[in-house]
Amino acid sequence: LYKQLSMPSEYYSFKKGDWVFIMLNTNEIASYANIAGTPKENEWNRMQEQIKQIKGKYAYEWNGGISEKQMQWLDRLLKKCEKKGLSVLIFSHHPLYPQSDFSALNGNEIVDTLSKYSCVKAAFSGHHHAGAFGYYKNIPLITLEGMVETENQNAYAIVEISQDHLLVKGQGRASSYSFK
């Protein structure tokens, strides 16, 4: 699908000025992903078992996560960004935090990785149409409201970025945020 959408790969990053935008693929490891008979199927099974052990409430068939390979790529990329003094925004389909019925299967591992780097300024996600917001070790994590269930109301946000400020201007039922 990503090729049909002219995306460079399943997960990727791009740089604009002193900002790096990282697009995670939280649909990579999922019940609906084409992973049967591959090493990713083992990762799926491992994630499900770990979630059951911690009594996580997000081990549902509509959620997904990222592979160990993608996690290693993310860690290497963040390390480079930190070293170069760049600022980073993270984007994913599934919420990373706070935990909900719609969270990424390995969201805890992802936010632990993000929190190691001061270059990460915020993370944005969707999937949970009600929206959500939380801080994880000083990183704002924003789940943007959806518009699927709101036929007569729109929801989108415009993000304005400057050297020392991040402004999320919610429209319709979308929330607004401001971060320094």
Specify the residue positions occupied by each region the protein language model found.
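Active-site neighborhood of phospho(di)ester-bond hydrolases with catalytic His/Asp-centered motifs
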Residues: L89-S92, S118-G131, I142-E145
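A cross-domain feature marking catalytic cores of carbohydrate-active enzymes
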Residues: S92-H94, G170
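A solvent-exposed, acidic/Ser-Thr-rich amphipathic alpha-helical stretch
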Residues: A104
